């Protein structure tokens, strides 16, 4: 079996919103990489032993006092280095070049760079050719400052009308700098550039692929767990489902899954989870029907934050009770993924590889005294999904829209009652079913229904009725940090509204939420 961690790239984070995207792109190319804060020590870099280093972008100005710098060792480690945006500027400054503060001359958005000379990084890449026969590339810029003089040993590789050094290179030392962002899709040939860097320049082999990751994970799980038993909180979400499948392959019946039905799930979700994991895949599952316990605990509580805490607390209590029944369990499995690890790391002393475990199940009690098993902690969400497919989980389950941890507890506004949850479940199922029918489900990033604790007058037949209101919500987004409301066709919305009002007794009015994020959040609570 090839070692999937043998070849690796280190990415130093200077605070750019795109840094995780760089890591995901390198992984897509088939090379393992890790993301660390910029102030990593020489000893830590030596221990990691990367085949190449990427200096990512960042919001600071290199010209400002105390702005972040790459460790000096980066440039003496004897491995290729790629500086992106701020990364190029700090590379230039640290190696004897010059950076000037942008005064109204920054480049933001689409730009076309003109290639001035050949470089390994840009080998065979062009989007167009200008009248002088020089290759042109379509790229995405986002910078105010710019390099005004490059360090000794470097050459200018590309320019724009306002930026004389859009790319620079020292081919001998294999140091490269680009002022644009190759990791974003708007840079059309960005993946090819990153591929040149990781595979050709750094000499990495493309060993990082789903089948190899699964093989490696199973091997490591067997080694870590031995003959012990493991307990896992299975929610039916992507992460816990993939963890369950990996562990099932690694240790079989020594895995016990605890599935807690809190009464806040989607229509028929509990039955689907039990059918798929219990009947179809043959996992050992304890099914806890705790609907009344959760609803009783939330009785009279309307505050969203308080509801979240109650749901988290009750889950932990139940999980604790059930785990005591598994007296032989020595390990607790969790669906911690790489972005959780990065969030926990921070800067200065918290490099992503030395952080404390990230408890993603709402703080399990310390007295459980179980070892932690986190087979997904190196993976991004898109990688987890690809692994899930390889393990035989259905596509529509792995790629369905996000569902909040507290479930309908934060989609029923105000106090949560069984009646409200039942109405909301049915209305939401109609909305999702119609999105699939109209081939719109995968065209929006997230769609759901919200229950409003408001009664509204309606007319049914000859009589009037005074029933509840629901709101439909659908958004389009790339990263869920910002989002546009989805412009769904009027006739589609009309069809959904008609079906809900006619088929769900107790709902008299349907509205559509046309708020963007910001100022609104995607979820209502």
Curated annotation (Swiss-Prot):
The protein's annotated pathway: Purine metabolism; GMP biosynthesis; GMP from XMP (L-Gln route): step 1/1
Recorded GO MF terms: ATP binding; GMP synthase activity
Residues engaged in binding ATP: 235-241
GO CC terms in record: cytosol
Keywords: ATP-binding, Glutamine amidotransferase, GMP biosynthesis, Ligase, Nucleotide-binding, Purine biosynthesis
Transmembrane segments: none
Catalytic activity: XMP + L-glutamine + ATP + H2O = GMP + L-glutamate + AMP + diphosphate + 2 H(+)
Limits of the Glutamine amidotransferase type-1 domain: 8-207
Keyword check for Protein transport: no
Domain of life from the UniProt record: Bacteria
Domain GMPS ATP-PPase as annotated: residue spans: 208-400
Gene3D superfamilies: 3.30.300.10, 3.40.50.880, HUPs (3.40.50.620)
EC number(s) on file: 6.3.5.2
InterPro entries reported in the protein's UniProt record: Class_I_gatase-like, GATASE, GMP_synth_C, GMP_synth_GATase, GMP_synthase, GMPS_ATP_PPase_dom, NAD/GMP_synthase, Rossmann-like_a/b/a_fold
Protein function: Catalyzes the synthesis of GMP from XMP.
Subunit structure: Homodimer.
Name this polypeptide is given: GMP synthase [glutamine-hydrolyzing]
GN (gene name): guaA
